[in-house]
Design a protein with these regions (language model features):
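Conserved catalytic core of sirtuin-type NAD+-dependent deacylases
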Residues: 1-166
Length: 167
């Protein structure tokens, strides 16, 4: 069976109504990266960062996968398909894609602020400011902040290397 690897970014979810970051009316038009998407922002203004990602989760909750998400998921009927996405939403999974690698993290999960490999599903759609991980540390959004390494990069490169076709 042919292996197809599909690489997606903000454009695929924009058609579902999710705001992108860099468009003129995107998220960075209303927020400064330094204020909501850096380790320093989390350290210095935890409440603002948590509120920002809670807002993003609420936005995602009201959106549905679009024809692009469904078409990618539909490829699994005939091909071995893996999705590598820069998106932090769960629209690929909700459309039916069974193997999705999120390069920049996932809004539906939180992680330990001490151990980046200790990842837990969020309890509901709102992160509590004082939520703690099983290791006792504060939980943080499971998002790769600017200035942080991309932990799934090597895995994505491995997946891409197995493709008969990269889309």
């Amino acid at each position: 069976m042919k292996k197809i690897v599909v690489f997606t970014g903000a454009g695929v979810s924009a058609d579902s109504g999710l705001a992108t970051f860099r468009d003129s009316d995107g998220l960075w038009a209303n927020y400064r990266i330094e204020d909501v998407c850096t380790p320093e922002a989390l350290r210095d203004n935890r409440a603002q960062v948590v509120d920002f990602y809670n807002m993003r989760r609420r936005e995602m909750l009201g959106k549905e996968p679009n024809a692009g998400h469904r078409a990618i998921a539909g490829l699994e009927k005939c091909f071995d398909v893996e999705v590598i996405t820069q998106n932090v939403d769960n629209l690929h999974e909700r459309a039916g894609s069974s193997r999705v690698t999120h390069l920049h993290g996932e809004l539906t999960k939180l992680r330990s602020s001490r151990d980046p490999e200790l990842i837990v599903p969020i309890d509901g759609w709102e992160q509590r400011l004082d939520a703690t991980a099983p290791d006792g540390s504060l939980l943080r959004p499971h998002i790769v902040f600017f200035g942080e390494a991309v932990p799934m990069f090597e895995r994505a490169a491995e997946i891409a290397g197995t493709a008969d076709l990269m889309v």
